[in-house]
């Protein structure tokens, strides 16, 4: 009877229920085509010197950084993201034991520190190595990169928003109060405070020193508590301290905001964005990051993270960062309409690359309403020799002036204005001149066109490329490959919210997901005989 031994702490005391069988090697228990073998072999080919540099010392008889890297990549492949769940798998799953090579399972804190303190430092370097290895294997083309972006929620707490508009408004009110307060102090205590356009923190500190000097000279003793009357000087100093703290707070928040319009108090790198996952259908903003994927031959070859909600300003930093890390350069850039801008067109051209970017008006330009809209420049007759447009009524719109406008990224665009000298009595006036909010009466208004010649030229060239047979195939592959990578991450891998706070940690998590997905994709291609395939062909009707 072993019943009395079941309640003992040592469960091996009733091991007669289990017969130990030889061999004990895990190598025999794991199938030859299991992806865990591919993970191990792939990581062994990588140079992890940058990862090892992040460690001061590595203890013996513990899992090495290379082994932990294998663990977290394989965990991502199997939708395991929590450090505690990874540790549990290391104790129960023979595939994880195979990667540990007989070493004890690392603690959950060790795994969390590995991701946040060590892997995050060299995450881009390791992703670049994986992309270079795939290129050497002939698995990626190195010619065409498909780019797309999505938003993933950060690990910030709810309702921790800080809005730039509210900060600037409150700061302006504070400056008004400070001007009155400084003038009042000058009148009460006979002092002089010198400042230029606006009162700064340094100005308030100098004023505080002057008031403290008066306190010492007059021997004023500050009092506290109920029933004790404060002097005017004490009230002024306490009010000054409150103003000083508020001004410091607003200055710090504006510095944290940078060129953003919002951030979260508990994750200052995250920006509030409108997400597609809106359960309440009220357009609620959530702290998130804009993740950019560069996909080639179904593999994620590069990743970048941006605080900007829109994709337009993310393309140039993405391409520069990718070129600095990868050992090869892409010649074709394929992206959707969210990336179209004059600045992006020019950068891609100057960088020796070809743009296949879907114009923002591509879909609407195919509609009947768009083609019959006489107010649009595209539906007017253009004379290049005179640089003028002829409207529906046969009147000529000539160049009147040029204006320069600066975008949020600092790019300067030149806009040319075309104006009709007289639209009086035109029967098409109400159809041609838009905008009902103008204060000028309709009968006194004339037709004006604002045209960016550079943008129009680059868009026309790009439209010709994307409507060709090759361009159509690239657009189809962008939909399949780039958008498919986010479908894999969000749906198949069930990753919709970051576990670690901070931009660097969020990027590290995204790169771990990408590396895990790439190994899964390589395993799938090997087993189905699709290795070396780059593009999906167009379907013929």
How does the language model describe each region?
Residues 31-73:
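Basic, short loop/linker segments at the boundary and entry of helix-turn-helix/winged-helix-like folds
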Residues 58, 98-103, 132:
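Catalytic micro-motifs at enzyme active sites that drive phosphoryl/nucleotidyl and oxygen chemistry
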Residues 7-10, 55-59, 470-473:
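A ubiquitous short alpha-helical element
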């Amino acid at each position: 009877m072993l019943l009395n031994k079941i309640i003992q702490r040592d469960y091996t005391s009733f091991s007669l229920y289990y017969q130990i069988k030889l061999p004990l090697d895990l190598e025999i228990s794991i199938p030859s085509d299991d992806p865990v073998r591919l993970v191990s072999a792939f990581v062994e080919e990588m140079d992890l010197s940058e990862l090892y540099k992040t460690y001061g010392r590595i203890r013996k008889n513990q899992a090495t950084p290379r082994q932990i890297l294998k663990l977290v990549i394989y965990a991502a492949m199997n939708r395991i993201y929590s450090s505690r769940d990874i540790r549990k798998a290391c104790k129960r799953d023979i595939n994880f034991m195979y990667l540990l090579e007989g070493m004890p399972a690392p603690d959950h804190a060790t795994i969390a520190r590995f991701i946040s303190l060590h892997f995050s430092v060299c995450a881009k370097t390791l992703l670049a190595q994986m992309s270079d290895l795939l290129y050497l294997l002939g698995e990626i083309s190195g010619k065409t990169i498909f780019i797309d972006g999505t938003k993933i929620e950060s690990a910030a707490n709810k309702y921790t928003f800080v809005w730039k508009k509210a900060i600037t408004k409150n700061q302006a009110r504070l400056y008004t109060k400070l001007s009155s307060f400084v003038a009042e102090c000058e009148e009460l205590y006979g002092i002089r405070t010198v400042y230029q356009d606006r009162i700064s923190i340094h100005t308030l500190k100098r004023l505080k020193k002057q008031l403290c000097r008066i306190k010492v000279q007059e021997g004023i003793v500050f009092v506290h508590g109920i029933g004790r009357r404060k002097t005017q000087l004490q009230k002024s100093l306490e009010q000054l301290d409150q103003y000083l703290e508020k001004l410091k707070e607003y200055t710090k928040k504006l510095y944290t905001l940078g060129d953003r319009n919002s951030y979260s108090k508990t994750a200052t790198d995250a920006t509030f964005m409108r997400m597609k996952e809106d359960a309440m259908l009220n357009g609620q903003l959530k702290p998130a990051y804009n993740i950019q994927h560069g996909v080639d031959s179904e593999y994620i070859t590069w990743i970048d993270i941006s605080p900007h909600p829109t994709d337009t300003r993310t393309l140039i930093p993405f391409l520069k960062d990718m070129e600095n890390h990868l050992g090869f350069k892409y010649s074709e850039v394929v992206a959707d309409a969210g990336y179209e801008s004059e600045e992006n067109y020019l950068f891609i051209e100057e960088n020796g690359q070809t743009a296949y970017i879907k114009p923002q008006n591509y879909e609407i330009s195919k509609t009947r309403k768009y083609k019959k809209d006489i107010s649009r420049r595209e539906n007017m007759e253009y004379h290049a020799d005179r640089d003028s447009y002829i409207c529906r009524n046969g009147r000529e719109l000539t160049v009147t002036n040029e204006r320069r406008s600066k975008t949020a990224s600092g790019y300067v665009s030149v806009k040319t204005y075309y104006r009709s000298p007289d639209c009086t009595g035109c029967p098409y006036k109400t159809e041609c001149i838009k905008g009902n909010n103008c204060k000028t009466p309709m009968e006194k208004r004339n037709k004006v066109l604002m045209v960016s010649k550079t943008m129009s030229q680059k868009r026309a060239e790009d439209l010709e490329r994307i409507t060709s047979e090759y361009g159509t195939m690239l657009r189809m592959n962008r939909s399949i490959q780039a958008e498919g990578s986010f479908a894999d991450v969000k749906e198949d891998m069930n990753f919709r919210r970051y576990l670690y706070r901070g931009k660097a940690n969020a990027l590290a998590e995204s790169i771990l997901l990408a590396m895990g997905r790439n190994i899964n994709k390589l395993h799938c291609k090997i087993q189905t005989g699709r290795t070396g395939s780059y593009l999906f062909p167009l379907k013929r009707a």
